[in-house]
């Protein structure tokens, strides 16, 4: 199915507002398995809007118009579409009642005749109630082409799409089911290379790689009748993908860490800490508290995190954590010694089960003859103190700090998974 989005409003063309509705609608259509082929913006002009609707009707199966449903004369989307379809405008009873209720709480004089326009729908259409505003939307199919009219304000549009349009379209068309696989420790180019035969020959299910800062996701999607069939198809494909190895011979299953569009290494780690009733602390240098603030962003963080340390200078590392200053000077702050000492002292001082530390060179300049992006991450438990060295090259200072934090969460996550295997 080919869909087209038409944004109506002169303010979009003049740059007064950004058309965020287009991104939102495109994402929602993709989730439903509906391909958006065209996006058009047109001003508040009947002649030009008629021309755009005519063109869209010749090349698309689903035409979605957003904006121009308000009470003023330049709000002419429904009127113009009705004219194109040779349909009358009629009043929707529910929308009229909402207008009555709205103005009953205000001065009678505030209700003017033009407000009634917001309760109109195209004859024969399915009204789409507006939970957060007054302008009713609508859905109608004529000569095999479906048309949707939606309000322009994003808060009204999103509510109407999520609560009214998506359920309606799901009934009308086959549903697209998706599963998002998340990877850390492998780049997008390498992942695409080792999975090239799957990607090049894909039909159904489909595979869509996407790179984010420090990690990669794969969206697996299939169009099918129900969730059970989708789970079977996507599960089989997932097993095949994770059986592959990186160019270094590492199983992809080892760099896969979880599912979901909104998931993260931090969330996975937090949930494991809660699951096994473990507490954690951190001593941070180059990340300056980013690890701790990320952890504290989850509701219930106090179950696993009571506090930690931010020690930027060598002197503060010695003062706050009780590390020998002469040893720090000897080994340098960018070293395995310092990372391990910070992690262990943080654990001992707070009584946490796990101590993690981050020290290194955020950049852009070198430090202690170490290039920008050099990071040491320490991890201490009751039984072991260890560290890893990572090089995050060619990145901004902000990215180095963020990706270093991802490495720290991943290190803790792997430690907790080893604990899981011992239970």
From Swiss-Prot:
Domain of life per record: Bacteria
Family statement: Belongs to the CinA family.
Coiled coil: none
Name of the protein in question: Putative competence-damage inducible protein
């Amino acid at each position: 199915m080919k869909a087209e989005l038409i944004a109506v409003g002169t303010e979009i063309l003049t740059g007064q507002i950004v058309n965020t509705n287009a991104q939102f609608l495109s994402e929602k259509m993709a989730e439903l398995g509906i391909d958006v082929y065209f996006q058009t913006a047109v001003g508040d002009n009947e002649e030009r809007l008629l021309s755009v609707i005519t063109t869209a009707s010749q090349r698309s199966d689903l035409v979605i118009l957003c904006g121009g449903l308000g009470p003023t004369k330049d709000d002419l989307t429904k009127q113009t579409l009705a004219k194109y379809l040779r349909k009358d405008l009629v009043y929707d009873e529910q929308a009229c009642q909402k207008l009555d209720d709205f103005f009953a709480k205000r001065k009678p004089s505030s209700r003017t005749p033009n407000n009634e326009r917001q309760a109109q729908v195209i004859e024969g259409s399915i009204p789409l109630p507006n939970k957060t505003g007054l302008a009713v939307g609508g859905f109608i199919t004529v000569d095999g082409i479906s048309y949707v009219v939606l309000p322009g304000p994003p808060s009204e549009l999103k509510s109407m799409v999520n609560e009214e349009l998506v359920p309606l379209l799901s009934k009308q068309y086959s549903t697209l089911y998706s599963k998002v696989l998340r990877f850390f420790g492998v780049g997008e180019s390498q992942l695409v290379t080792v999975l090239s035969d799957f990607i090049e020959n894909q039909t159904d299910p489909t595979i869509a790689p996407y790179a984010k800062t420090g990690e990669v996701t794969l969206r697996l999607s299939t169009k099918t009748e129900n969730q059970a069939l989708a789970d079977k198809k996507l599960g089989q494909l997932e097993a095949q993908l994770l059986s592959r190895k990186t160019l270094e011979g590492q199983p992809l299953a080892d760099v896969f860490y979880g599912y979901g569009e909104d998931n993260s290494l931090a969330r996975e780690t937090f949930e494991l800490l809660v699951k096994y009733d473990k507490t954690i602390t951190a001593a941070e240098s180059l990340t300056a508290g980013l690890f701790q603030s990320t952890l504290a962003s989850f509701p219930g963080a106090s179950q696993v995190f009571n506090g930690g340390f931010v020690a930027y200078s060598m002197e503060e590392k010695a003062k706050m954590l009780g590390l020998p200053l002469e040893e720090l000077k000897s080994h340098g702050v960018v070293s395995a010694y310092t990372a391990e000492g910070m992690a262990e002292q943080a654990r001992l001082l707070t009584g946490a089960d796990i101590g993690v530390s981050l020290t290194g060179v955020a950049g852009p300049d070198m430090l202690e003859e170490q290039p920008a992006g050099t990071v040491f991450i320490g991890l201490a438990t009751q039984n072991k103190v260890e560290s890893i060295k990572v090089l995050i090259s060619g990145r901004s200072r902000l990215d180095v700090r963020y990706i270093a934090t991802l490495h720290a969460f991943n290190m803790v996550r792997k430690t907790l998974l080893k604990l899981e295997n011992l239970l």
